[in-house]
């Protein structure tokens, strides 16, 4: 662990607002208000991902609590899906474990409440078919009631988002869409206009996972997305070290880390680690390291 002392202050989480009349959204985006507060502090956000129900529900909730205590500002709570084609092997293994344990979509709202109560923003990251199956309107309502900030939808494009835009506007929820270097300028403009909270920039549309080196494609993409009109752009490109987090944080509004965190609870064969205490200690350590790296991004 990096033996550096750093001080930081979380942006205060906001209580959920009542549903607005159809077609009207709250003026302020929940996540954007946090990103704005952090920008004023001179640092990017630390955005961490963890799948609900992995390796079991109680441990996943404990892991999320550890992440928030160790410096995560915004937590993406993953909904396990049976065909996670855009996820790498680490998150695929974690999702399979959660599904095998019988995790249910309805339980994610308990995780949202906990993360919100612990002082971080809670986003749910989900493949769109899960939301459709649950019911878009009901999911939006329950998400808002739980204090959640919105959804990250990796496989949903703006053109097919009519019902989600309607319901997220009704309940004041954020809409986070993904873009890649392959996205056209017209696509970036359309996405930037429709998104609320931030636009999620990836190194490429496809499988996620940890990387040993960073390319400059994400930095170029961030510049293009800003030019397209997005006020906040956060980057997820397989960051796994404090140095990488600092590099990405120098140009992004938020650094998104997923596989490296989930990996802490998996053994070398892709199975849940038996010693949960040590696994959670490892999670706390890497979160602290990454948080320190992010704190150095603009110094």
Where are these regions (language model features)?
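Active-site mouth loops of central-metabolism enzymes
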Residues: 46-62, 123-135, 174-183, 211
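Glycine-rich phosphate-binding active-site loops on the catalytic face of alpha/beta enzymes
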Residues: 73-82, 148-152, 157, 199-209, ...
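Active-site-adjacent beta->alpha loops and helix N-cap segments on the catalytic face
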Residues: 26-38, 57, 81-93, 100-113, ...
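Alpha/beta catalytic cores of nucleotide-metabolism and tRNA/nucleoside-modifying enzymes
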Residues: 20-26, 223-231, 240-299
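N-terminal amphipathic alpha-helix/helix-capping segment at the start of soluble metabolic enzymes
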Residues: 2-12, 20-49, 112-113, 298
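Conserved, mostly hydrophobic/aromatic
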Residues: 48, 67, 78, 143, ...
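Alpha-helix-loop-beta-strand connector modules within alpha/beta enzyme cores
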Residues: 88-123, 166-180, 216-233, 281-299
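Catalytic cores of alpha/beta
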Residues: 58-67, 183-193, 235, 239-255
């Amino acid at each position: 662990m990096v033996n550096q002392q750093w001080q930081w202050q979380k942006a205060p989480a906001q209580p959920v607002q009542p549903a607005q009349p159809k077609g009207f959204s709250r003026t302020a985006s929940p996540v954007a208000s946090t990103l704005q507060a952090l920008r004023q502090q001179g640092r990017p956000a630390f955005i961490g991902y963890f799948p609900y129900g992995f390796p079991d529900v109680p441990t996943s909730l404990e892991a999320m609590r550890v992440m928030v205590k160790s410096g995560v500002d915004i937590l993406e709570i993953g909904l396990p899906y049976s065909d996670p084609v855009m996820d790498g092997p680490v998150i695929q293994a974690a999702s399979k474990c959660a599904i095998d344990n019988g995790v249910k979509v309805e339980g994610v709202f308990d995780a949202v409440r906990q993360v919100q109560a612990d002082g971080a923003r809670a986003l749910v990251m989900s493949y769109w078919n899960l939301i459709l199956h649950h019911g878009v309107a009901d999911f939006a309502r329950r998400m808002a009631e739980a204090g959640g900030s919105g959804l990250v939808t990796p496989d949903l494009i703006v053109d097919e988002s009519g019902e989600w835009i309607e319901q997220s506007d009704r309940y004041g929820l954020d809409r986070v869409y993904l873009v890649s270097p392959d996205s056209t300028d017209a696509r970036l403009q359309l996405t930037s206009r429709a998104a609320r909270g931030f636009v999620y920039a990836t190194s490429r549309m496809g499988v996620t996972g940890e990387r040993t080196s960073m390319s400059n494609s994400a930095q170029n993409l961030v510049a293009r997305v800003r030019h397209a009109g997005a006020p906040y752009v956060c980057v997820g490109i397989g960051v796994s070290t404090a140095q990488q987090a600092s590099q990405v944080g120098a140009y992004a509004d938020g650094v998104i880390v997923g596989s490296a965190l989930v990996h802490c609870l998996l053994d070398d064969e892709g199975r849940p680690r038996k010693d949960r205490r040590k696994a959670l200690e490892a999670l706390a350590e890497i979160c602290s390291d990454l948080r320190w790296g992010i704190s150095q991004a603009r110094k």
